[in-house]
């Protein structure tokens, strides 16, 4: 079983373009997902909701579906939506999802939402930002120090949309009793460091306490973008 805690709040724009999902598929399988929409006016909000609802409906119909197929179906849903409403052709969204089955996690990721994996005193990133900035860092064209002020840090190289091919990061890994996974949109992780998250995890015995502390930390900063955090902890009896 897992225990979960979450929040999702609008930034300065008013309408929250983030969406998330926590769904128990059967006694041992759980689906968690997070999306950060984009596309102007209502496009971003529609895109993230559309992606999350597509995942939910697919896995409710078939709990044993694989994430690769589910992500392909999300894009088909976008294509169908834009065919009916061409004004939404620029909408897109990040999408990051996990299937937790006992002690195994299957992950699929597109965009720059993140999953952090916490165990004891450690924290690692399970996703890699599919952004122009991350590519420049990988190619050592820009340093981490310069990256903080890079003006195009929000430019994504892969998103879920009707017209662009997406690049799927997929992986599987094992988790242990007490491990925690945190899903964060960029509006959240841009305002809190991995070190602070790790420290809060060490001092909060419940996942709800950790997520609450992260929210308090974020809301003490100057908020610009929508911010969403989904946390879960594996509890093996």
Locate predicted features.
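PP2C/PPM-type serine/threonine phosphatase catalytic domain
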Residues: 1-237
